Amino acid sequence: HLEGTAKLAQEYCIDLLKPMAEKIAKYHDIGKYAKTFQKRLEGASVSFCHAVCGAIAYQEQANQRDVFTPMLTYCIAGHHTGLMDGGTRVDTPEDGTLAGCLKRKEDYTGENDYTTYQEEYLVQPLTAEEEQPALAELLSVRKDPFEVLERYAFFTKLLFSCLTDADFLDTERFCNPDTKRGMQGDFKQALEILNHRFSE
C-alpha cells in the first residue's frame, strides 16, 4: 500500500513536488506496523492514531534545518483528520496541534511501537538534491515574505491533496477492485445550463 500510494501521489503531483509526494506517501501509514493496529485489523475494538507515527518518524529522520520538514509532517499527521493547526513549542502531547502530536513519541512504546517497519521497509527523508527545485522556487520570491508563505501554504495543500487522493484510491483498488472511476457527462450542456441560469 505504501508503494502504491507513493506511485499515485507522484502521478497526481506537479513535477516540482514529486519527491515530496513520494516521501509523505511512503511514511503515511508506517504506524500500522504497531501490534495495536494489527489487532484492530483482526477485529479488536482498540483506538490507535497511526497517522502521527509517520510524522514523528519523518521529523526524527529529517534534517532539522530542512524548511520542508514541517510541510511534510503536516501532510502525514493529518492524512485522515485534515491539516491541523501548527501550534507552538509550548504545546503538550495532549494538544491537538501538530506541535503537540509530534511530542507523543512516548505513546508509541510496547504494543504501540511501530518501528518494526524498519525491518522490512526502507524509507528515507528528502535529500538536499530532492528538495532543491522547490527550495529554488521559494527563494525566487524571497524579497516578498508574504509570497513565500503563500507558496509554502499552496505546496502544503497540494501535497496533502495528492496524498489523501492516492491513499483513498489505492485502498479502494485493494478493497473494491471493480470500482469504476472517471467523470462522465455532457460538460458542454452543463456549461450552457449554468450560463442560462446566471443570465436569468
Q: Model-predicted segments: where are they?
A:
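Accessory nucleic-acid engagement/destabilization modules that flank
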Residues: H1-R197
